Amino acid sequence: MPDTYIAIMLQSLKKKEQVLDEIIRLDDRQKDTLTDPECPFDVFDETVEAKSACIDQLNQLDSGFEKLYAQVAEELDQNREDYAKEIRDMQQCIRRVTDKSVKIQAQEARNKELMREKFATIHRQAKAVRKNSRAITGYYNSTVSYTHLRAHETLANLV
């Protein structure tokens, strides 16, 4: 029975690597959406939702791994030599998972800064639009007033 649990744990770690690879890919896609001014916001939203699904999957994998480990920890500890290869394989997977996690953290920090810059740009653009809108409204009001005034003068001259 412990052999089966250990095999499942190793399989779980490999699946976690695949999910982390997907998150790395999605982080790159997110960077592209943040740096492309023409990219619709929907694409960014889809990427965030896909990453959220991956994170949920990681949490499930972690939970399952921990439960299995709790059941075989004593067996692994007592019979280290019997499970040396499996332990080595798991350690290698854990190293790769850790490396990928570090890469993801760096990508997330970069994307957070890009997002901050993008929102600052959007804020500046919105401010400029409001300012231009007020200027156009002011121009329109002054034009209407002038036209109204000229129409009044013409009417007075006709009578």
Tell me the role of every PLM-derived stretch.
Residues Q60-D82:
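Short, solvent-exposed, charged loop/turn and helix-capping segments
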Residues P2-Q57:
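Long, hydrophobic N-terminal alpha-helical segment
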Residues E117-S145:
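Charged, polyampholytic interaction/assembly segments that form long, compositionally biased interfaces
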